[in-house]
Regions:
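Residue-level preference for beta-strand/loop junctions
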Residues: 13, 29, 57-59, 72, ...
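N-terminal helix initiation/capping motif
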Residues: 1-40, 111-118
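Short solvent-exposed strand/turn elements
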Residues: 51-55, 91-111
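Extended Gly/Ser/Thr-rich low-complexity repeat segments
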Residues: 56-66, 104-117
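Short beta-strand-centered aromatic/proline hotspots
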Residues: 35, 76-81
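Short conserved beta-strand and strand-loop elements enriched in small hydrophobics
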Residues: 17-24, 58-73
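Short, conserved beta-turn/loop elements at beta-strand boundaries and strand-helix junctions
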Residues: 42, 84-88
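Short strand-loop-strand
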Residues: 25-58, 62, 93-95
Length: 118
């Protein structure tokens, strides 16, 4: 399994950020599940959840999260690319289908997070 983590820009969070996700397959949506975001780039995200998620091309994942307190949540769909076990959770790599605007919002939020770090 080849994991592409050599993107130009990926931010690793000291403390994971929580968010929600749901899966869509053949137009049907699953109930929302909780996730923790461990790292993010403008076009990808690593999430952890105790749930077993399917890794197949016919299922898309929709993630919703706010990188900054009080900011409008981002709602982006994507594809689960790989799975890795960590302690009691599964870590999933997700390729996000981001627009240029989504990518810009992610970059600006990360810049703000870095600036506010002690």
């Amino acid at each position: 399994l080849k994991i592409k983590r050599n993107e130009s820009f990926r931010y690793h969070f000291d403390e994971p950020i929580t968010g929600e996700f749901y899966l869509v397959k053949e137009g049907r949506r699953t109930p929302a599940g909780l996730m923790e975001i461990h790292n993010i780039s403008p076009s990808g995200i690593a999430i952890a959840t105790p749930l077993k998620l399917p890794i197949d091309r016919s299922t898309s994942i929709v993630v919703e999260f706010s990188l900054l307190l009080g900011s409008e949540p981002l709602n982006v769909s994507g594809q689960i690319l790989h799975e890795k076990w960590t302690e009691a959770q599964r870590l999933y790599g997700v390729r996000l289908d981001t627009t240029k605007e989504d990518q810009q919002r992610i970059i600006e939020a990360i810049k703000q997070i870095v600036k506010e770090k002690p």
